């Protein structure tokens, strides 16, 4: 049995509330026959009155029958993590499936991973770089905006796919047991392929414009961890809400369009007043984008304050989001 623990109940014990007691049945017993299966409805005998679990336990012990005590397994945080580790093969399968489905029946396939960051970069360069003449920290605006788009598109696409993942896989939720967290997790991880393609394009642009990375590249692994944790946390929060309230799904595209202006994708952080900097830094993507720009393009010193505040925010978002998801996952099959 999935997610159930069973063991023999010792003599003179009483089963606590919320457990099931099966008298005279062990794991070696065959399934009982159903003699009334073909009996017409009108000829069925009157149902017997059943007592509470504790009384069933007492009656079973009085009749000297073996008693099996069945209770749900623990679903704590450590138990959930262990379940994810045990199902790592399933996670790999779901990630591969996400990637195949995304580009199935597509004329250019993985080419969309190239075009998706390229088109916004061209639009931002014309509107904000040429017309609005926003500052770009002394580097070409095309390179400046593309360096911000690469992590932002991973975040926005990962959140969008993660939010829609439970609804898209609703048929799986009621048919088989597995850690539900694997569904949004696979959607978020699968977007890392697109991120790698966009990063290769960014490196090519750096060579073209002569941008030289600095020692800050040593911080990039932590910046990527912040980006992934933030994406997973937001995806868990919103996917849990979306499967209960479909309004979240409809409002998501509008929300993503607004959020892009809360991060320094098209403008530098120097435009933000100092009195707003701490509040602004609560968005983890601010530290991620500015940190990557500093490390790869050498635009300015590493923004340690933004990274420190963003690190705390990303951890809070990830932990709270996954905890909320795990607490609510029992109702997914009912509301999907």
Go through each PLM region and give its residues.
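Hydrophobic transmembrane alpha-helices and immediately adjacent juxtamembrane helices
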Residues: 2-12, 19-336
């Amino acid at each position: 049995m999935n997610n159930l623990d069973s063991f023999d109940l010792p003599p003179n014990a009483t089963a606590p509330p919320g457990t099931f007691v099966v008298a005279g049945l062990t794991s070696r017993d065959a399934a009982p026959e159903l003699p009334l299966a073909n009996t017409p409805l009108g000829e069925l005998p009157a149902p017997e009155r059943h007592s509470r679990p504790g009384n069933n336990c007492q009656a079973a012990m009085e009749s000297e029958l073996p008693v099996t005590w069945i209770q749900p397994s623990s679903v704590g945080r450590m138990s959930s993590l262990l379940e994810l580790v045990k199902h790592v093969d399933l996670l790999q399968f779901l990630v591969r499936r996400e990637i195949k489905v995304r580009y199935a029946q597509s004329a250019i396939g993985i080419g969309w991973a190239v075009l998706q960051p390229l088109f916004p970069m061209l639009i931002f360069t014309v509107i904000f770089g040429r017309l609005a003449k926003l500052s770009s920290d002394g580097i070409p605006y095309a390179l400046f905006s593309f360096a911000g788009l690469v992590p932002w598109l991973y975040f926005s696409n990962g959140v969008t796919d993660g939010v829609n993942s439970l609804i898209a896989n609703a048929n799986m939720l009621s048919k088989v047991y597995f850690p539900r967290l694997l569904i949004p997790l696979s959607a978020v991880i699968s977007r890392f392929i697109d991120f790698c393609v966009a990063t290769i394009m960014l490196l090519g642009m750096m060579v073209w414009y002569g941008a030289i990375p600095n020692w800050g590249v040593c911080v990039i692994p932590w910046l990527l961890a912040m980006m992934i944790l933030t994406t997973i946390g937001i995806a868990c929060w919103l996917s849990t809400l979306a499967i209960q309230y479909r309004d979240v799904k409809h409002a998501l595209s509008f929300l993503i369009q607004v959020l892009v202006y809360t991060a320094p994708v098209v403008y530098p952080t120097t435009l933000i007043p100092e009195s707003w900097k701490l509040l602004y830094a609560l968005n983890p993507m601010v530290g991620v984008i500015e940190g990557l720009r500093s490390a790869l393009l050498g635009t300015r010193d590493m923004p340690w304050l933004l990274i420190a505040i963003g690190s705390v925010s990303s951890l809070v978002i990830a932990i709270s989001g996954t905890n909320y998801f795990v607490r609510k996952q029992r109702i997914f099959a009912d509301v999907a």
